[in-house]
Design a protein with these regions (language model features):
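Amphipathic alpha-helical segments enriched in hydrophobic/aromatic residues interleaved with Lys/Arg
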Residues: 112-169
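Ligand-binding loop in jelly-roll beta-barrel domains
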Residues: 78-102, 106-108
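Basic/polar phosphate-binding segments, predominantly the helix-turn-helix DNA-binding elements
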Residues: 175-182, 200-248, 253-295
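Generic protein-terminus/edge-of-domain signal
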Residues: 1-72, 79-81, 85-88, 110-119, ...
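Short, flexible helix-adjacent loops and helix caps
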Residues: 156-160, 182-186, 207
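Intrinsic-disorder/low-complexity linker and hinge segments
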Residues: 185-193
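Solvent-exposed, amphipathic alpha-helical segments
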Residues: 54, 143-157, 194-205, 249, ...
């Protein structure tokens, strides 16, 4: 079977916020323009799949998984997938450009459940045999459906500011998912939650003296295993991630506070202000003092 490549311009026309929603009601083929439900495809954006009725077999990167009402899972960009079978399927697809939403998604990293579901579950999907996906009970799914229908109505309204309303609603849905994932009693999900806790701890306590040994204990993993998993999910090492986080926080304080550069360095976990200045220049190609004057 040939793989179709879907691109963001097919779903996010214009310069508005790159968030879109599509729905599938039943088993009829081609239910909307660009419907690739039954066609093996990839896309250069992320897709959140929420199944509200029925079920089927969903093929992801060479493996078929059974899915049913209540299941929620993320398809990351450049992931091959499609429905091999579907039975009375009703689902909502939320498509979004995670690069465009990076600033908002970064804020959500303070939530361990968000990190576990959105960052780590896709990586562990194969080795967990999809047992770490989120599954909502009917009453919770009915509550979420109200949010989904509100988002769908906003997209279809075409009213001024609808892109901002879409953004606010999708962030609300992400928070709801993060909260429910953190409450999951699934042992596989709890493994990922501990990894998510590593990210949220660093985000919320970035000035602390974090080490790989300390972080790997939170994740309940051997340091070597933890380093590999973290690099796969985040694209960098834990220490580089922490350094980037501290520098970013420092940049915000330089612009939004009257604190001295030495105070900001200490607040962000740098005991040596000269070392802080060197690292800051590596990231922003200017000194902290120059950055403050510029902004």
């Amino acid at each position: 079977m040939k793989t179709v490549k879907a691109v963001r311009s097919d779903f996010f026309p214009g310069e508005g916020c790159p968030i879109a929603m599509r729905t599938i009601q039943g088993d009829a083929p081609i239910q909307h323009e660009g419907d690739l439900t039954d066609i093996r495809h990839t896309h250069d954006f992320a897709e959140l799949i929420i199944i509200t009725r029925g079920g089927g077999m969903h093929w992801i990167d060479g493996i078929s998984y059974e899915v049913a009402a209540g299941d929620i899972f993320l398809i990351q960009d450049n992931t091959e997938h499609y429905f091999q079978e579907r039975h009375d399927l009703e689902m909502y697809n939320i498509m979004f450009d995670d690069k465009y939403l990076a600033e908002h998604l970064r804020s959500l990293r303070s939530l361990s459940g968000f990190n576990a579901f959105f960052l780590f579950e896709p990586i562990f999907r194969r080795r967990h045999a999809f047992m770490s996906k989120l599954h909502l009970a009917p009453e919770l799914m009915n509550s979420l459906r109200k949010n989904l229908n509100g988002m769908l109505a906003e997209e279809r309204s075409g009213l001024p500011g609808s892109d901002l309303m879409m953004l606010s609603k999708v962030l609300e849905i992400f928070v709801l998912i993060a909260r429910e994932y953190s409450r999951s009693s699934n042992s596989k999900a709890q493994t990922l939650y501990r990894l998510g806790e590593v990210i949220s701890r660093m985000e919320n306590q970035y000035s602390e003296n974090w080490t790989v040994a300390r972080l790997s204990r939170i994740a309940a993993m051997a340091p070597s295993t933890f380093l590999g998993v973290f690099k796969e999910a985040m694209g960098t090492s834990p220490i580089e991630y922490l350094l980037n986080l501290r520098i970013t926080k420092a940049a915000g304080l330089l612009v939004n506070s009257q604190k001295s550069i030495t105070e900001i360095a200490q607040d962000c976990g740098f005991n040596d202000s000269n070392y802080f200045s060197r690292q800051f220049r590596n990231y922003y190609n200017c000194s902290p003092r120059e950055y403050r004057k510029r902004f």
